[in-house]
Amino acid sequence: MKLLHLFIAFLIFNFSFLIPLKVLPQQTNKYFKVEVQKDVFIETWFLLYLPDGYDTINQSWPLVLFLHGSGERGNILEMVKKNGPPKLAEFGKSFPFILVSPQCPEDQRWSTDVLDMLLDEMAARYRVDSSRIYVTGLSMGGQGTWDLAIAYPDRFAAIAPICGKVDPGDAAKLKDIPIWVFHGAKDDIVPPEMSENMVNALKAMGSDVKFTLYPDAGHDSWTETYENPEFWEWLLEQHR
C-alpha cells in the first residue's frame, strides 16, 4: 500500500506540470510620444497593467495613475516597480482597474501637462471609465499628485497623495474632490506639516478630506497605505 501511495504521489507531482496555470495579468512596457509644439516632442515610458478579464469582458474600467518618487527617475523602467502598486502587481496582486505607472526623466519633476496628455492617450486607446480616473503617488509623486489635481481638478474622481509637498494656498481648487492624504509623523524628508496644513485648509473650505497620520512611520508612509484593502475600496467607490 505504501508503494501505491508513493506511485500516485509521483504521478501527481510530475503531471501537475502539464496542467496549465492561470496566467496573471502582467505589466508591459509602453512608450508615449507627443508633439507639444512644432517639431518639439515629449517622450515618456510607462508600465501598463490591464486587469484580469480586460480582453474578455466588454466594459469600461477604472484607471489609476501612479506617480513614483524621486529615487525611481531615469531611463530604467524596472525601477518604477520598486514601490507602490507596480511593486504589488509585480508580485502577483490582482487589481480590478487599469494601472498606468509612468517614469519621470532624470533630474526632472512631474509635468502636469505631459501627464494630462498621457491620460488622454490612455482614454483613446483603452476602455477607460472617464468617471473613475484616480491619481496617487508617493513623495515626489505625492507632490505630483497634488500638482496634477490642482492643474486639472475636473479630471479626477479622487486623489490620494502620500507624503507630498503642497501649497495650502491652492486648497480652493481641490475642495470638491474626494481626497485621502497620508503621511508619517516622523517623516524627516517631507515634514508632516505639509500635509496637515493642506488638510486644515481644505477642511476650512468644507471639504470632507480624509487624513491618516501614521504615528510611528518615517518617510515611508506608502507601504502600509498601498497594502491596506480599505484604501483601495474607498478609492474605487469614488465617482466623478
Language-model-derived ranges and their functions:
Residues 1-27:
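Bacterial Sec-dependent N-terminal signal peptides
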Residues 52-59, 107-140, 153:
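Gly/Ser-rich "nucleophile elbow"/oxyanion-hole loop immediately N-terminal to the catalytic nucleophile
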Residues 135-137, 162, 182:
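Short beta-strand immediately N-terminal to the catalytic nucleophile in serine-hydrolase-like folds
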Residues 63, 67-118:
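Active-site machinery of serine-nucleophile hydrolases
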Residues 178-182, 186-240:
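C-terminal catalytic histidine-bearing segment of alpha/beta-hydrolase fold enzymes
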Residues 155-165:
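A conserved short beta-strand
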Residues 18-61, 136-138, 143, 148, ...:
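A domain-start/cap signature at the N-terminus of enzymes
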